[in-house]
Swiss-Prot record:
Segment forming the signal sequence: none
Phylogenetic lineage: Bacteria, Pseudomonadati, Pseudomonadota, Gammaproteobacteria, Lysobacterales
HAMAP family: PPAT_bact (MF_00151)
Key word Heme present: no
Species of the source: Stenotrophomonas maltophilia (strain R551-3)
Described purpose of this protein according to its UniProt entry: Reversibly transfers an adenylyl group from ATP to 4'-phosphopantetheine, yielding dephospho-CoA (dPCoA) and pyrophosphate.
Chain positions recorded as substrate binding sites: T14, K46, L78, R92
GO molecular function (one): pantetheine-phosphate adenylyltransferase activity
Name of the protein in question: Phosphopantetheine adenylyltransferase
Gene3D superfamilies: HUPs
The EC number(s) this enzyme carries: 2.7.7.3
Any one GO BP annotation for this protein: coenzyme A biosynthetic process
Cofactor or coenzyme needed: Mg(2+)
Subunit details: Homohexamer.
Top EC class for this record: transferase
Length: 169
């Protein structure tokens, strides 16, 4: 078994798309750890709007200014991924009290699967507390302005998805 390293944090998510809220959380976590691994999950059951490789590239573009942040796509059980990168801390964001019940359940399950790893919850900066990838996708799909919620490269990717869907209709 791989030994967990408490100086390596893993921040998993679908990141469909990565938002300014995600970026803020990573930016605040990066100084706390030797390394932060952003694990971009395949998550086929969620039916992502953007393919895994594009989500990985967008996250790398948004987070590339952090020398201790690595973005990796994965399609395995989270516990296996965390062990493969020798993570010792699992980072999770809590935007609102409504997130807590789900995140508490996930933390409890992860404690059973990877007992050597601790889950650490971070709250977002106030200006990002209402941002979610699903809301961003829905607003973008309906032609709304999401420029205040995502980096420019993500905005462009969402525009292309919308145009492609419009062309199919």
């Amino acid at each position: 078994m791989t030994v967990a390293n408490r100086r390596i944090a893993v921040y998993p998510g679908t990141f469909d798309p990565i938002t300014n809220g995600h970026i803020d959380l990573v930016s605040r976590a990066a100084p706390l750890f030797e390394k932060v691994v952003v694990g971009v999950a395949q998550s086929p059951s969620k039916g992502p709007a953007l393919p895994l490789e594009q989500r990985v590239q967008l996250a790398r573009g948004a987070l590339g200014h952090h020398s201790n942040v690595e973005v990796i796509g994965f399609d395995t059980l989270l516990a296996h991924f965390v062990r493969s990168v020798q993570g010792g801390v699992l980072l999770r964001g809590l935007r609102a009290v409504s997130d807590f019940e789900y995140e508490f359940q996930m933390a409890s399950m992860n404690r059973h699967l990877i007992p050597e790893v601790e889950t650490l919850f971070l709250t977002p900066a106030e200006q990002h507390s209402f941002i979610s990838s699903s809301l961003v996708r829905e607003i973008a799909r309906l032609g709304g302005d999401v420029s205040g919620f995502v980096p420019a490269a993500v905005l462009e990717a969402l525009r292309k998805v919308r145009e492609a869907k419009s062309a199919q209709s």
